Regions:
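Catalytic phosphate-handling regions of large nucleic-acid enzymes and associated NTPases
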Residues: 5, 101, 302-331, 353-375
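Hydrophobic (often cysteine-bearing) scaffold residues that line and stabilize catalytic clefts
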Residues: 15, 111-115, 160, 164, ...
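Long, highly charged, low-complexity internal segments
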Residues: 39, 47-81, 92, 188-303, ...
Length: 398
């Protein structure tokens, strides 16, 4: 009698192999690894997606206004071109009699959930689901994650949100793209995000075209030690040249007296930990990197080097359960240019506060921070080092 097994579905081969290593699945096959307890397989990103309009009938074969809007009663799924081989492997494994349950180990986020659920739906697999939810792919994180697997039902709403996003993109994008193309007899495209972004660009362009600059004037008094700027009740800018000249005439030949000098200490707070958007913004401003370049670099630092946590986060905060790991994370980055700062922090003790630790402000994933994985800076490319440096300096600053 065959032993019951758990099938683990990862999003990419590299992560699947990392998980297989931790679970000691050494029996390598084409597209999966297994042992007497687990089968670890993987997608290649999306293996399954929403079917094109042509799948809903002949009337959608040709682009014309008569067939619009396209509003399928039930959205169909299809295996993506080039993914058929791996889908067949995964589908076959899901159907094996000894596989009694599934662990979804795709990226811990909305799209990762969709990758796995669409595969399960297409394969008509209704076996019990558990979820591996981790923010880094180090051996330690994977091992801890398997000790704390969550019921798949907890993520049903996340799947529904991803499904709504995908179906919304299909309905808006394909209908409007066909309508525009047919109406204007030109290859035009539209989309839920694309069209909204284009509108923002158009509005900005119109504002620039219609902007009418207004001159203003300042009055400066230069001394050997410093420069004084005249300031009235409404600020230092004077809209009228005539008014500026009148003020200047009144001050000519007069002496200024410094009546008081006050010094006040100011405390500047850290800008906070990085989420993906702010990291992309800073990488563009400082290094000229596009958002896609930054994300690709972050994926390598997360998946290949395993030295930063999950990149696709929209939170700048940590949860309380991360706090006990901060000391170990600091010790891991106590190298090279960061050693002195880490030493000072550890000497004074780690103090957390609501400015960066707040469970209520973390939904799927906490802010981007270093993992407990040992770092070898020499193994990083120039661009990887730049992004890593930004994240570590932010981490140290809080």
């Amino acid at each position: 009698m065959s032993q019951n097994k758990t099938l683990v579905l990862a999003e990419k081969p590299s992560v699947g192999k990392d998980i297989a290593h931790v679970l000691k699945c050494k029996n390598g096959q084409n597209g999966y690894l297994e042992n007497d307890r687990y089968i670890v397989t993987w997608a290649l990103g999306h293996l399954v997606s929403l079917a094109d309009p042509e799948a809903y009938g002949e009337k959608y074969q040709n682009w014309n206004m008569e067939s619009l809007p396209m509003l399928p009663e039930h959205m169909k799924l299809t295996v993506l071109k080039g993914s058929g081989k791996q889908y067949k492997i995964v589908s076959s494994l899901l159907g094996r009699s000894e596989v009694k349950d599934i662990v979804i180990a795709t990226d811990a986020g909305r799209e990762g959930e969709l990758v796995a659920r669409w595969i399960l739906d297409k394969a008509h697999c209704h076996k019990p689901i558990r979820r591996l939810w981790i923010s880094s792919v180090t051996d330690k994180a994977i091992s801890e994650g398997f000790k704390n697997l969550k019921p798949g039902t907890e993520f049903n709403n996340l799947y529904r949100a991803a499904q709504c996003r995908a179906e919304g993109d299909w309905l808006v994008g394909l209908n409007i793209t066909r309508a525009l193309t047919v109406k204007y007899n030109a290859q035009l495209s539209a989309g839920r995000v694309q069209s909204a972004t284009l509108n923002m660009i158009v509005e900005r362009e119109e504002a620039i075209k219609n902007f009418k600059p207004k001159p203003y004037y300042n009055i400066l008094a230069k001394t050997p030690q410093f420069t004084l700027t005249w300031q009235g009740q409404h600020g230092k800018n004077i809209n009228s040249k005539e008014t500026a000249e009148k003020i200047l005439q009144k001050m000519k030949g007069k002496s200024a007296v410094i009546k008081d000098i006050s010094k006040k200490p100011k405390k500047s707070t850290s800008p906070g930990l990085y989420d993906l958007t702010e990291l992309q913004r800073d990488a563009n401003r400082l290094f000229g990197m596009s958002p896609k370049e930054t994300l690709n670099i972050m994926q390598r630092l997360y998946e290949s080097h395993k030295i930063l946590t999950y990149p696709r986060t929209d939170s700048k905060y940590l949860t309380q359960d991360i706090v006990p790991t901060l000391s170990e994370r600091l010790k891991t980055i106590s190298i090279g240019p960061y050693k002195a700062a880490v030493s000072e922090i550890l000497k004074l003790g780690i103090h957390t506060n609501k400015s960066f630790v707040d469970d209520r402000k973390v939904s799927d994933h906490h802010a981007i921070i270093p993992t407990e994985q040992r770092v070898i800076l020499a193994n990083l490319s120039t661009d990887e080092r730049k992004i890593y440096d930004l994240v570590i300096k932010r981490f140290l600053s809080v």
